[in-house]
């Protein structure tokens, strides 16, 4: 193996006739030789350590490929193999479908889409159309089953099938008990209100009765006193059945009182007249004057 200088980025690499990787850069002093020194004129910046040394490519003849074996279109599908081709547009390439790994991909669509300006309509195989339908059925079946987890970590989750709404919906509760309870409450409240109202009315009535009874007793006492005052004036009480005196009514007592008062006024007037005559016949020395008119008046 021949060692040469490390080429830089501008160095061109070619294959010669005997299949060896040869550097076209002219040879310079070898930095690893024994007579190398720091004083030697070496362009250290021209060395590129990233590029390897030239090495021979010893490839056997049976591994060499004949250009006739390569097809004219590298990206075209083989003629004897027919697979499932699915179009991959710009939107489908960014799709996040996690279950489309088993669907084949045809590279011919990419090459044809780049070469032609108007791509053909994508063809979808029946297998690819059946797959999403079956997956949708399985997902709907999984959603129909409700998984119930237990609060205890030792118990495993149990799956219970979700029954139909008609079977699980309970029968409507009867409305009569709440209505009866509300009616009872209303009746109780009404009864309590009526009881309180009747109690208040009874208290007012009792107080009024007490006041009225006291007034009647006082009035009766006044009428009795008036009746007793008129008994000495000659006013007789009417008899009831002729058996004896009976109590007068209030109206009769008032009538007798009016007559008695009139009689008293007449007597008072006669007395005042007599007093005036006596004053006229009385002398200043206390002597009484005798005349015929006074004698007639006395008689």
UniProtKB/Swiss-Prot annotation:
It holds the Pfam family HLH. Residues 203-216 are annotated as: Basic motif. Residues 254-281 form a coiled coil. Residues 161-170 have a biased composition (Low complexity). Keywords: Coiled coil, Nucleus, Transcription, Transcription regulation. GO terms for molecular function: DNA-binding transcription activator activity; protein dimerization activity; RNA polymerase II cis-regulatory region sequence-specific DNA binding. GO terms for cellular component: chromatin; nucleus. Key transcription factors critical for hypoxia adaptation and virulence. Plays a major role in regulation of heme biosynthesis and carbohydrate metabolism early in the response to hypoxia. This is Transcription factor srbB. The lineage of its organism: Eukaryota, Fungi, Dikarya, Ascomycota, Pezizomycotina. The gene is srbB.
């Amino acid at each position: 193996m021949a060692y040469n200088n490390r080429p830089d980025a501008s160095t061109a690499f070619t294959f010669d006739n005997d299949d060896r990787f040869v550097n076209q850069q002219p040879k310079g002093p070898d930095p690893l030789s024994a007579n190398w020194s720091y004083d030697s004129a070496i362009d250290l910046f021209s060395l590129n350590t990233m590029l390897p040394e030239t090495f021979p490519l010893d490839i056997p003849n049976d591994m060499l490929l004949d250009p006739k074996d390569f097809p004219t279109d590298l990206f075209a599908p083989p003629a004897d193999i027919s697979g499932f081709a699915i179009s991959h547009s710009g939107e489908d390439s960014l799709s996040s479908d996690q279950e489309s790994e088993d669907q084949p991909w045809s590279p011919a669509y990419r090459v044809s889409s780049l070469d032609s300006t108007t791509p053909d309509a994508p063809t979808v195989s029946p297998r690819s159309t059946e797959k999403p339908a079956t997956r949708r059925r399985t997902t709907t079946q999984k959603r129909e089953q409700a998984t119930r987890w237990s609060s205890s970590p030792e118990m495993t989750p149990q799956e219970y099938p979700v029954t139909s709404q008609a079977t699980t919906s309970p029968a409507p509760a009867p409305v009569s008990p709440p209505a009866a309870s509300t009616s009872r409450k209303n009746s109780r409240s009404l009864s309590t209100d009526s009881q309180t109202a009747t109690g208040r009315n009874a208290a007012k009535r009792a107080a009024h009765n007490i006041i009225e009874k006291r007034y009647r007793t006082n009035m009766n006492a006044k009428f009795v006193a008036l009746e007793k005052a008129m008994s000495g004036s000659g006013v007789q009480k009417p008899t009831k059945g002729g058996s004896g005196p009976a109590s007068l009514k209030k109206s009769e007592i008032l009538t007798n009182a009016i007559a008695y008062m009139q009689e008293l006024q007449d007597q008072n007037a006669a007395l005042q007249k007599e007093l005036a005559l006596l004053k006229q016949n009385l002398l200043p020395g206390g002597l009484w004057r005798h005349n015929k008119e006074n004698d007639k008046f006395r008689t």
